[in-house]
Amino acid sequence: MIDPVLEYRLSQIQSRINEDRFLKNNGSGNEIGFWIFDYPAQCELQVREHLKYLLRHLEKDHKFACLNVFQIIIDMLNERGLFERVCQQEVKVGTETLKKQLAGPLNQKKIADFIAKKVDLAAQDFVILTGMGNAWPLVRGHELMSALQDVMGFTPLLMFYPGTYSGYNLSPLTDTGSQNYYRAFRLVPDTGPAATLNPQ
């Protein structure tokens, strides 16, 4: 079922991206140009469908990279010849144990450095991150964005995030009890007091 509020928010993304305050960080003070589009995890398919449309239209006017974080994890493991072994291990030990085992090979700094190695970040108008739902819990949004601060330079970053973002706390998927502090801009807030590009 289509979520009408989410559909409206999705329809606003392109115009927000085209604004100078996104592309040039105008009006954001000295804060880094990191943006989050949060959405209900159960609406993942609705977001994916809109992304196909959005990317086609953005390609007409912008040079950008759209990166699937889950695919990045797979690529990193494949480069080290670990992917097949990791798949077998997940079946044996479960996701939580696997996460602990991969804390070294897949720490957030290594993921950020891998992205910087694969993409000329300075040459992009902006970078879009998707696939956070599939990558969780191996990758946490607030930890990855913190690590990316060291490699993004002045290039704006937009993360599509299945969960909720209050302007200060990221709660993954439907886990409202888990609140992880991170300061970024909410690209298209809900209606009401939070309906501003810059969080209060």
UniProtKB/Swiss-Prot annotation:
Keywords, A to Z, come to: Antiviral defense
One example of a Gene Ontology biological process annotation: defense response to virus
**Induction of synthesis:** Transcribed at slowly increasing levels as cells progress from lag to exponential to stationary phase.
In terms of Pfam families, this protein maps to:
BrxB
**From which domain of life does this come?**
Bacteria
Summary of the knockout phenotype? No methylation of 5'-GGTAAG-3' in chromosomal DNA, BREX no longer confers phage resistance.
Task: State the function annotated in the UniProt record.
Answer: BREX systems (bacteriophage exclusion) provide immunity against bacteriophage. Part of a type 1 BREX system which protects against dsDNA phage. This system allows phage adsorption but prevents phage DNA replication, without degradation of the phage DNA. Methylation of bacterial DNA by PglX guides self/non-self discrimination.
What is the similarity comment for this entry? Belongs to the BrxB family.
| UniProt-recorded name of the protein | BREX protein BrxB
**Which species does this protein come from?**
Escherichia coli O9:H4 (strain HS)
